[in-house]
């Protein structure tokens, strides 16, 4: 059975925010960044445990994983059964303590 990728509303909102931010500089660049984030997430269909266990989110009831895309963004996700839930796209330039309080 193929793994499904499910984007949470929060992750989709963040994706929109990233696009809007970069669009002010260049719509072409914004599109490229969002497309890379989206296509990177698709690799999780084949390799759902490809990301590292996210140490800043240790202690939550689910095992959050992450991997870096586009130098400054982490896809934060967890695997449950045949589904990968992308819960956030985290800008790694932010204060890491904020990540612990997002869920």
Where are each of the predicted segments found?
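Arg/Lys-rich, positively charged N-terminal/basic patches that mediate binding to nucleic acids
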Residues: 1-36
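Solvent-exposed interaction patches of small proteins and small membrane subunits
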Residues: 25, 29-32, 36, 52-56, ...
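Hydrophobic alpha-helical segments of small multi-pass membrane proteins
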Residues: 36-39, 65
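Short proline/glycine- and basic residue-enriched helix-capping loop/turn segments at helix->loop/beta transitions
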Residues: 45
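Basic/aromatic recognition patch in beta-strand/loop cores that engages polyanionic ligands
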Residues: 49-81
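Enriched for short, Lys/Arg-rich terminal
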Residues: 69, 73-103
């Amino acid at each position: 059975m193929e793994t499904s990728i499910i984007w949470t509303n929060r992750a989709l909102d963040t994706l929109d925010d990233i696009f809007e931010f970069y669009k002010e500089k260049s719509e072409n660049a914004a599109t490229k960044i969002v497309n890379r984030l989206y296509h990177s997430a698709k690799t999780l269909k084949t390799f759902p445990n490809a990301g590292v266990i996210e140490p800043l989110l240790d202690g939550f009831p689910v095992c959050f994983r992450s991997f870096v895309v586009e130098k400054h963004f982490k896809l934060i996700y967890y695997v449950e059964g045949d589904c990968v839930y992308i819960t956030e796209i985290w800008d790694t330039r932010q204060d890491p303590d904020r990540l612990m309080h997002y869920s």
